[in-house]
Amino acid sequence: MLVSLLGILLSVIVGFVVTLISTKWVIGLCKKRGFTGKDINKLTKDDVPVLGGIGIVAGFVAGSFTFLLTSYNLSPGIENVVVSILLSSLIIGFLGLLDDIFNISQATRAFLPIFASIPLILYSVGHTIISIPFLGKVNFGILFYIIILPATLTITANAFNMLEGLNGLGAGMGLIMALALAYIGLKSGGTSFYAGIVSIILASVLFGFLIFNFYPAKTFPGNIGTYFIGSVIGSIGISGYMYTALFFLYLPYVIEFVLKAKTRFKGVSFGKIDDQGYLHWDSKPNSLTHIVMRIGKFKEYHIVLIIWGIEILFAILAVVFQTVTITI
């Protein structure tokens, strides 16, 4: 057990350190190659590197691989969880990078996470029997792998990409989600426990990335980062049988989806900045960020902290309902 705990600790440290090193390197590379975007929520509209998500991918892969190496012979069945999530994350990371570089159309981009579901299907992660409130347990059989699993991963990845645009918002939301899933998983056994460990690694990586991404951001995650985080969160939830938790954790994104759908997904999440640095939105809200802007006078980091607070409340509900009340 001691060796296993040391392996977990080493994996978390490796993930965190590699994220710091690789993100700093990517920032320099993006500045040299011109991979930057305007920070439109600032008065100065500075150019900010947009491929910071590469650091997230590198840190997560390094941390997960370290955990796999240090725990493979000690934990039967760990390969299915870690390897499937690792392969899935590499696929979505690569596709996200292509999107950032070549600007893939929105319609095509929406279906990219389906490819990331292939390793999860091949390793048969998840459980075909799902407990549904008021209906009881339902065995979806093969439909789980050909419909439910790919659909879940597609939804979690695309939804996560919708609510972004403010410094640190997405990475912080991902950190909260990862900590909630880690708590649930580590309280459980078997596959859920392994998924919880992977979630701890993701949390350490996102914490490291936030050092560069929180206000004022030195880099943006890009589509590679947002799709990656959403996809990994979905993979962890699926492999750890934490479907109820995923439902509650993604409720803010359900709100975001409804608001964006009203604009036919052409809406934005950023606001209009005044000369004092406060963000405003006077039109009909097409993002959760706009709702916050309309209820008070806030600067960018205030809005981020408020939405983080909302996500923390849903994370608490996720933990309670997943571990105490029901299991979907």
From Swiss-Prot:
Key word Transmembrane present: yes
Domain of life: Archaea
EC identifiers of the protein: 2.7.8.15
Record comment: activity regulation: Inhibited by tunicamycin.
EC main group: transferase
Regions that span the bilayer: 1-21, 48-68, 78-98, 107-127, 129-149, 166-186, 192-212, 228-248, 301-321
Entry-linked InterPro entries: Glycosyl_transferase_4
GO CC terms, sorted: plasma membrane
One example GO MF annotation: glycosyltransferase activity
Keyword Transcription attached: no
Membrane topology note: Multi-pass membrane protein
Database matches in Pfam families: Glycos_transf_4
Gene Ontology biological process terms, A to Z: cell wall macromolecule biosynthetic process; cell wall organization
Keywords per UniProt: Cell membrane, Glycosyltransferase, Membrane, Transferase, Transmembrane, Transmembrane helix
Catalytic activity: a di-trans,poly-cis-dolichyl phosphate + UDP-N-acetyl-alpha-D-glucosamine = an N-acetyl-alpha-D-glucosaminyl-diphospho-di-trans,poly-cis-dolichol + UMP
Subcellular location: Cell membrane
Predominant subcellular localization, coarse grouping: membrane
Entry's family note: Belongs to the glycosyltransferase 4 family.
Protein name (database record): Putative UDP-N-acetylglucosamine--dolichyl-phosphate N-acetylglucosaminephosphotransferase
Annotated source species: Sulfolobus acidocaldarius (strain ATCC 33909 / DSM 639 / JCM 8929 / NBRC 15157 / NCIMB 11770)
Lineage: Archaea, Thermoproteota, Thermoprotei, Sulfolobales, Sulfolobaceae
